[in-house]
Amino acid sequence: MRLFITCLLFCSISISQNISDQRPISTYSIVALDEETGELGVAVQSNWFSVGFLVPWVKAGVGAVATQSFVKVDYGPDGLKLMERGMSATNALKSLIDKDEAEAVRQVAMIDINGNVSAHTGERCIVFANHVVGNNYSVQANMMENSTVPKAMAIAFENSTGDLADKMMAALEAAENEGGDIRGKQSAAMVIMSGKPTGVEWKDTKLSLRIEDHPTPLKELKRLIRIHRAYQHANKGDYYMEKDQIDNALIEYTKASEYYPENPELPYWSAVALVNGGRVNEA
């Protein structure tokens, strides 16, 4: 019955709002700031193909935006531009909402580098739809199986340990454990940008992962985060090899292997480091 009502609501919104060019990204997401590092991030899962192409927007030293429901992608780049010019997340979101004739079907959250957070869930977003704003984060969801999803995400984020990726991942997993998207699951994404911007995007990107189409996108995202960390250590190992710091390189290659034991190549580089250091017997 709920699904039938949801379908009727979906159709009525599409007709009455005349927004056929928009896409209904029914999903759950989090925008967050790591107060210690200044890193900004967005994480999201949806039963929609390639959600990472539309929902998450982050700029180092500026802010982060998640735009979903009947998504208007402009909220992402336009929100970041306003925050970069000095506008708070609250004022930036209000400015864009005030100009949007279809704000009733939008769900948007913004956070700026100073920790100001704001979120909007339009009154015609498909139920269950809600958001929770907390200290340095906002979680939001629409078309959920249960109304408890945002609260569960907030609790998980606040009570989890680790870095920003760990905490945002905990929020996504909590949402799924509460029932998640009423339609199922298909894609996920996580983007984290540096708290110390250089102005060079690839240098400022701490993590950028997209699961485009997968039966268990959160499990795959978590796996790729682990592999990402492995290669972060491998890259540090390469750096130390360039500096002829063999012991430091070995430490990093070993950590890489611990994160990604399925990959036989990573121990190989430990052996290479030992040989280059004249420690052939240990290799």
Residue ranges and their predicted role:
Residues 3-13:
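Sec-dependent N-terminal signal peptides
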Residues 17-183, 190, 212-248, 254, ...:
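Alpha/propeptide regions of enzymes that mature by internal proteolysis
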Residues 188-196:
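Core structural elements
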Residues 202-203, 232:
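Soluble secreted/lumenal catalytic domains
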Residues 185-187, 206:
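Active-site lining segments that contact anionic ligands and/or coordinate catalytic metals
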Residues 205-212:
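Nucleic-acid 5′ end/cap handling module spanning
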Residues 268-272:
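Conserved alpha-helical positions within TPR/SEL1-like repeat arrays
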